[in-house]
Design a protein with these regions (language model features):
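Noncatalytic, basic helical substrate-engagement surface that gates or grips nucleic-acid strands
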Residues: 1-129, 133-155, 230-233, 239-247, ...
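Generic detection of long, well-ordered alpha-helical segments
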Residues: 30-33, 79-83, 227-228, 256-260, ...
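A generic alpha-helix structural signal
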Residues: 33, 37-40, 86, 90, ...
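Non-catalytic nucleic-acid-binding/docking modules located in mid-to-C-terminal regions
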Residues: 48-53, 96, 121, 142-144, ...
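A short, flexible N-terminal coil/short beta segment enriched in small residues
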Residues: 73-76, 262, 300-307
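Charged, flexible boundary elements
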Residues: 101-111, 279-307
Length: 307
């Protein structure tokens, strides 16, 4: 059995930036909705998942924000045109009958990691759809990361190539490099290559900190010794919490039949002609009434939907 876990907000953003300047005839922005829905169709069509779920970030501040006020503080606010589309994308997910998870005060990455670990322990092959390198911490065994847009599969071997250490030690590398996206400080002046070399030569980050004599380069040795508190903080911020109280019942995650009439209604509203064509014949809601169109522009739109 397999389980596909979608990092919701990650793909909302990717869809938003992948397609520009798309809206319906009423001027309602639809680019993210269209791109995200296409991704769902592609995933369901090509991978035919046995089970599937989407995980969303909560707007409530997390434990990471409590221990470090600057966590993600540099990120610009979500664009208004994307904000307005998120409720619609959530309705699309609901119409596809895809279960969703969201926990106030917890990040999607932690929830994804927790579900993935529990499912893998139950013998399920897990594929996480996320572009966040933090998720590479949980890769290994039955857990892989899959990017449907690039059609790339990241397994344990790929993580080792990238970070120079096994997945469970990725956070140690990030403790030194920091992460500009999440505003994790790390040690200024230490890049990924240097961090990989340092961490791969010791059994743990603590060993590197407790035994600076193992660092041959005097400049690096000084950088580590002068930033011990920052390094420990950065590791805490970078480490996923995969022990959340999340109930994972695979029976409730089984991929169900989409609510085609609901999808048809939304696609018509958003004027997604190409997506309407993907709804199977039996899924189209039959109309018992007719409409009279007297406006030329309305006729053009109607013919586009029908075509």
């Amino acid at each position: 059995m397999n389980l596909y876990l979608i990092d919701g907000h990650s793909y909302f953003y990717r869809a938003f930036h992948a397609i520009k300047n798309l809206s319906n005839s009423k001027g309602v922005p639809t680019n993210a909705i269209f791109g995200f829905t296409n991704m769902l169709f592609k995933l369901l069509r090509e991978k035919k998942p046995d089970a599937i779920a989407i995980v969303l970030d909560s707007p409530v501040p997390t434990e990471r924000h409590r221990i470090y006020e600057e966590y993600k503080a540099q990120r610009p606010g979500m664009p208004d045109d994307l904000v307005s589309q998120i409720p619609h994308m959530k309705k699309i997910v609901e119409a596809f009958r895809i279960p969703s998870f969201e926990m106030p005060g917890y990040e999607a990455d932690d929830i994804l990691g927790t579900i993935a670990k529990k499912a893998a322990a139950a013998g399920v092959d897990v594929f996480i759809l996320s572009g966040d390198k933090d998720m590479m911490q949980v890769v290994g065994g039955r857990i892989n990361i899959y990017d449907p847009m690039k059609e790339v599969l990241i397994d344990e071997a790929a993580v080792i190539v990238k970070f120079g250490v096994p997945p469970e030690r990725v956070a140690e590398v990030m403790a030194l490099t920091g992460d500009a996206i999440d505003n994790i400080p790390g040690v200024k002046g230490i890049g990924e290559k240097t961090a990989k070399d340092l961490i791969s030569c010791v059994c743990s980050l603590d060993e590197l900190i407790d035994h600076p004599e193992k660092i041959k380069n005097e400049r690096l040795r000084k950088m580590i010794s002068e930033n011990i508190d920052t390094i420990r903080l950065s590791k805490t911020l970078a480490t996923l919490d995969t022990g959340l109280q999340v109930e994972v019942d695979m029976k409730n995650l089984t991929a169900g039949k989409p609510d085609w009439p609901a999808l048809q209604k939304m696609f018509s509203e958003f004027e997604f002609t190409s997506l309407l064509k993907l709804i199977p014949a039996e899924g189209h809601k039959q109309r018992a009434s007719y409409i009279t169109i007297t406006d030329k522009n309305a006729l053009t739109i109607f013919l586009g939907l029908k075509g």
